[in-house]
Regions:
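Acidic active-site catalytic centers that drive phospho-/nucleotidyl reactions
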Residues: 42, 91, 100, 150, ...
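Structural signal for beta-propeller blades
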Residues: 46-48, 104-106, 163-166
């Protein structure tokens, strides 16, 4: 069937990337919040955009996270910046979580949301200004991609370059240790394996309720 509406382009026949309040560049994943707002990881522009209903073709976003405004797309390692964001999810309290792949971390943003706001918490790194590329640890991430919450509020993070999925349990805190690892025998291994227990460059994760 044909799509009924398009975001990121003025019409169904355009395909150009743009750094504007209505443009997108390499969008990866989307999620709806409890109010029906649509959130998009605009990966090529290093940002997350919120679109509020009613939706319309080529409409402008209402809010941007990861950049100070709608025309910037720079890369940085701060509490308010993103570098190649991919996974996106909301927890049961309405907090927004973003997998910041290029910075090797997952960020939590608490409402009320605002343009260019700072994150409240970071997983995968010791602070908001550090990017550590090191062997796997219980708290480290290397190119996190997909993220999802289960019905108990546990956060699953696909740790792509470490060939594993980590489970973090609430209550969450900066640089906390994961409670569980899937795809590896322990928290210090990163072996690629085509077995019932192994993983190799995983990208996405889901939860069954």
């Amino acid at each position: 069937m044909n799509a009924s509406l398009v975001l990121g382009q003025a019409n169904f026949t355009s395909r150009g990337a743009a750094t504007t309040n209505s443009g997108l560049s390499e969008p990866h994943l989307i999620v709806f919040d409890a109010s029906g707002n649509l959130w998009v990881t605009d990966t090529g522009n290093n940002r997350v955009l919120e679109f509020r209903p009613p939706f319309a073709n080529g409409m402008a976003a209402s809010l941007v996270i990861g950049q100070p405004d709608f025309v910037s797309s720079g890369v940085a390692t701060t509490g308010s910046s993103l570098d190649f964001p991919t996974g996106i999810a909301f927890d049961n309290s309405g907090n927004l979580w973003v997998a910041d792949l290029g910075n090797g971390r997952v960020l939590e943003f608490k409402p009320a949301f605002a343009n260019g706001m700072s994150a409240s918490l970071v997983l995968g790194q010791p602070d908001f200004t550090t990017v550590t590329i090191a062997p796997p640890t219980q708290s480290g991430l290397l190119a996190p991609f997909g993220i999802v919450f289960d019905s108990s509020g546990n956060l699953a993070v696909v740790d792509n370059n470490n060939n594993r999925t980590l489970i973090f349990t609430p209550s969450f805190s900066t640089h906390q240790n994961a409670a569980l690892v899937l795809g590896q025998a322990d928290f210090s291994s990163k072996v690629e394996a085509t077995t019932a227990t192994g993983q190799a460059g995983p990208n996405a994760v889901t939860a069954v309720f």
